[in-house]
Regions:
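Short hydrophobic alpha-helix segments
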Residues: 19, 71, 143, 173-175
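Intrinsically disordered, low-complexity, compositionally biased regions/tails
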Residues: 23, 74, 93, 171, ...
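Short, surface-exposed secondary-structure junctions/capping segments
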Residues: 33-41, 62-64, 87, 159, ...
Length: 192
């Protein structure tokens, strides 16, 4: 297995991308990896390390020197290494950041069980994630499951919402897709 590589991409003799890849293995299992790509004005850095059932990963994507997306996560796998039991850390999408933990395997099992998948109280007990406005490091609210009813079919399903500190809430998917209300974008970019 290759443990390192350097990459240079040229177009008409001009360097347009460079990259590096470095990894270590123990008994054929990767214990660390670092990947770096630069394609001006973008830079991407991805790192991964761990052993046993505990692993960590970081990602930073930058435009010039400004981070446009990133994460720092710790993952605990089940002893058989077939599933992730818990994820903790942060996901950064300036001007917001999500900090907290999720019991991933418990949520996957619950969502697969027709009797538990609509139990939003149980699903919410399996995560603790706060939403932070990054420039002031101010907590805006928390992530929580709410029941969504499809207007065409009437079928209910749990969906993630941002519950603001004043008790109001919006669907996370609407906010991230840009179809949330104007107030949601004001909340993300303005200090409260």
């Amino acid at each position: 297995m290759p443990t390192n590589a350097d990459l240079t991409m040229k177009i008409d003799l001009a360097v347009v991308m460079t990259g590096t890849y470095i990894t270590t293995f123990s008994g054929g299992v990767p214990t660390s990896a670092s990947i770096s790509l630069i394609m001006a004005p973008y830079q991407i850095q991805l790192d991964f390390s761990g052993s046993g059932v505990n692993y960590a990963s970081t990602l930073s994507m930058k435009l010039n020197s400004q981070e446009i997306m990133g994460y720092t996560m710790a993952m605990k796998y089940a002893s058989d290494m077939k599933s992730v039991e818990q994820i903790s850390g942060s996901v950064r999408m300036p001007p917001i950041r999500f900090d907290g933990w999720v019991n991933a395997q418990a949520m996957i099992v619950a969502m697969s069980d027709s009797t538990k998948r609509l139990d939003v109280a149980y699903l919410n007990s399996q995560m603790g994630v706060v939403v932070v406005q990054t420039s002031d490091d101010a907590q805006l609210g928390t992530l929580a499951f709410k029941l969504y009813t499809d207007p065409e079919t009437g079928i209910k399903s749990p969906q993630v919402a941002v519950v603001y500190s004043d008790g109001s809430w919006e669907w996370l998917a609407d906010i991230l897709s840009g179809s949330g209300t104007k107030s949601s974008f004001t909340r993300w970019s303005q200090p409260r």
